[in-house]
Amino acid sequence: MTAASHQQCPKCAYVRQEQDTAPEWQCPRCGVAYDKIITAPPADPGAPRKPGASAVARSRGQRFKAFRVTVLLIILIFVGTDTWLTRLRATSWGHPLRVVVYPINGDGSEAAAHYIAKLDVTRFAAIERIVKQQALHYGITLEDPMDIALAKPVNSIPPLPLRDGNMLKTIVWSLRLRLWASKWDGYGGPTPEVRAFTLYYDPKTHPVLEHSTGLEKGMIGVIKLFASDKMTAENNIVMLHELLHTLGATDKYDLRTDQPIYPDGYAEPDLQPRLPQHKAEIMAGRIPLAPNRAEIPDSLADVVIGPKTAHEIGWIK
């Protein structure tokens, strides 16, 4: 084997072989004169191959993804444990459930700003009354099972839930919401078990509102309401529905048709004849009147908390 063997052409990268007849100074393939001699070692089929740049990048990406998932799981375990303990204390009903309302101008309107400016805690008195009345029915004898307080307005819109998010995106949204809530928790009184961020909208420009959200993991409500004195009764129904969601209550209506589901979505499931009903189960949200027909109650006076919901929030063990 001569010294010129295995020389690599700087132009075409051809590695010179012993049998090549071209002059040693010239590439047998492209004919260029060598201006640089590169000694390449003989190819060894059994030698391990170094990974390319793309393989290295993929490996790094996979390690980073695994790291992110691990960190996310650690955060979820920590947050989940804290949430579980908070909910356990809240649903033991050994003391009043502390709820703090944080009003937000949802649409930036003057109507919502004016409504929030004159908002006071008496607007939620009907919620406290119905909870006390229904709790007594299930043997909860606290003087005030639910204690609602009002915080200063919040000048920020919370992260809104994704309509078609997958499980991972929903988890990330939940964590973002809890982080956002911790930044805007400016209430100066006792730490609340439930935080209700109420977004108010001008009913003239928003005659129909999107769904509200009651998050059990974190015990946070993002509740969309009308900035109108005339809509107080309707607002209170929506608000109580979402507050009970934060305590673990589930919906009791068909998500496709909005019709109450029998029997848990009926205020009087044993009534004969079954229809029409006279009141609404709070987590069903409507009074069943006839097959495939139900109406929204006028106020909380037309609402009950059924046995299934009472069990979910800890009133029935």
Can you name each region flagged by the protein language model?
Residues 39-49:
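Short, intrinsically disordered terminal segments enriched in charged and Pro/Gly residues
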Residues 6, 24:
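Residues immediately within or flanking Cys/His clusters that coordinate Zn2+
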Residues 31-40:
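Short Cys/His-rich micro-motifs in 6-15 aa windows
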Residues 179-255:
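Active-site-proximal segment of zinc-dependent metalloprotease catalytic domains
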Residues 11, 29:
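Short, cysteine/histidine-rich loop/knuckle motifs that typically chelate Zn2+
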Residues 52-81, 212-216, 221, 226-230, ...:
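Metalloprotease/metallohydrolase-associated module, dominated by Zn2+-dependent proteases
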